Amino acid sequence: MPLQSKLALGLSCLIATAIAVLTLTPVPAPPLGSVAESDKIYHVVAFGVLAFPMAYLRPRWLMLAVPAYLAFGGLIEILQPFVGRDRSLGDWLADLIGLGIGVVIGLAAGRFVPFARPRMRR
């Protein structure tokens, strides 16, 4: 398997694991008066970071990766009530927005900053 493929898969698995741990860990209720929508930025950033490596290193795999990432975000929302957290369509939509941003940035980075490939020795 080429290095780019290993990096794309490895980083995606690592980031997805971090997202799962952070979103499925029970947390105390936010203090009264806090803005309930403030966590949306975390969803956007997390799923943008999740999409970036695949978009940058293996853009052809996005046709499979993006639906898998969306299903992953949906599964997290389904499971959250079992760990004392709230299920939210808004969170899943924030995941979708983050994926879009991560894909756009990853594709742009891949176009303008190509992955450094070691030269073959002759």
Segments (PLM) and residue ranges:
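Bulky hydrophobic segments
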Residues: 1-92, 96-122
